[in-house]
Amino acid sequence: EIEAVAFPAHEAGKGTVRFNETAGSMAKDSVFNAASVLRRLTGKDMHDYDIHINAIGGGNIDGPSAGTAILACITSAVTGARIRQDVAVTGEISLAGRIRPVGGVFEKAYGARQAGIRTLVIPKENETDIPNDLLGLDIHPVETAEQAFSLIFEESPIKSEEA
């Protein structure tokens, strides 16, 4: 489980980002990918905020699989958009906002099911990793952050094209 909080920086463009020391280096790299995607989708610059990202329980996030979750948490913290609490997500986030495949998807799905989650958002390229109806989960394979956001958020945090 990952959470984030954001406050306007005291000086625009001089915000800071803090992530648990126990988070793996690849998870920390996901924060910088998320910054690019956040700006493209919402128009918000992460550097205008002081952001604290926390892996609850101080867990080590090994690898890039939390990238989409990190993006969702930062987006929620900066925009105020509410994340659905009945959805789990996995997937690496690219600079272009593509949801890239990750390892251990079946195990993550099983863990989500054990935690009472009913909806799981996974990379499209991992679609065949979980046999249909095996875990009783509503599985949504996605290719982009926009597709993931439509499932993760109660209301879209994406800026309108007209803005």
Language model segments and positions:
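Peripheral, non-AAA+ core regions of ATP-driven protein-machinery
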Residues: I2-A163
